[in-house]
């Protein structure tokens, strides 16, 4: 069908090479190759085709586009960050092989992976020299990834600095096990909770969290 439409004069570059972008996003390498051969712009919209291929884990298409000189580092290395976020480990390894470890926003790939709970990805990124930052911790904490936060705390041998606003976020989301973990690891939750958090907990009907707050003596401070 694609070949037929092109033969009928359809513009392969229409809408910023949208056809090529979709082929790259969904992994249709034969269609991607055909569109490129027909003149589709691989650099459209800041190299969007290769960024989509990387984000969705289509390594063969990433390699094909790099062979044709697409810029894997476009938009401040966003392909690497998005591949890490979506847990596309083989793509991340390949990009690192190509560009090395001196990439833009060097703590973001690990933070993005932490925000999705991808421990294997985090392990790899640590192995190539990325550091665990508070940003990575907060991404995992805010999204309720208890196992990931345990891993990050153990690896870094440090605790994140939990503010009122951070605690308020995880309370609103109902992440009771996260609150317990942080408290058990030494963060004094009962010293952070204030009347506003208590009121929000009640408003959101987070009764188990409210009971836990009572258990650790929060009411004495509000």
Swiss-Prot record:
ANK repeats lie at residues 1-14, 15-44, 45-74, 76-104, 105-134, 136-161, 163-191. It holds the Pfam family Ank. InterPro entries: Ankyrin-KH/SAM_domain, Ankyrin_rpt, Ankyrin_rpt-contain_sf. Keywords: ANK repeat, Repeat. The keyword Repeat applies. One of its GO terms (biological process) is innate immune response. Coiled coil: none annotated. Gene3D superfamilies: Ankyrin repeat-containing domain. PANTHER family: MASK PROTEIN, PROTEIN KINASE DOMAIN-CONTAINING PROTEIN. This is Putative ankyrin repeat protein L36.
């Amino acid at each position: 069908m694609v070949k037929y439409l092109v033969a009928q004069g359809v513009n392969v570059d229409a809408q910023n090479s949208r056809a090529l972008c979709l082929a790259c996003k969904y992994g249709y390498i034969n269609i991607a190759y055909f569109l490129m051969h027909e003149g589709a712009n691989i650099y459209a919209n800041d190299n969007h085709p290769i960024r989509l291929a990387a984000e969705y884990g289509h390594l063969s298409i990433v390699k094909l586009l790099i062979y044709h000189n697409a810029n894997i580092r476009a938009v401040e290395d966003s392909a690497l960050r998005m591949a890490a976020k979506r847990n596309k480990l083989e793509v991340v390894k390949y990009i690192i092989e190509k560009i090395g470890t001196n990439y833009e926003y060097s703590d973001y790939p690990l933070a993005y992976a932490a925000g999705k709970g991808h421990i294997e990805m985090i392990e790899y990124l640590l192995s190539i020299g990325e550091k665990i930052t508070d940003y990575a911790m907060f991404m995992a904490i805010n999204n309720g990834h208890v196992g990931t936060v345990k891993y990050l705390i153990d690896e870094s041998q440090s605790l994140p600095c939990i503010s009122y606003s951070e605690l308020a976020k995880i309370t609103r989301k109902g992440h009771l096990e996260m609150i317990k973990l942080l408290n058990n690891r030494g963060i004094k939750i009962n010293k952070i909770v204030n009347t506003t958090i208590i009121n929000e907990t009640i408003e959101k009907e987070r009764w188990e969290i409210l009971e836990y707050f009572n258990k650790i003596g929060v009411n004495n401070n509000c």
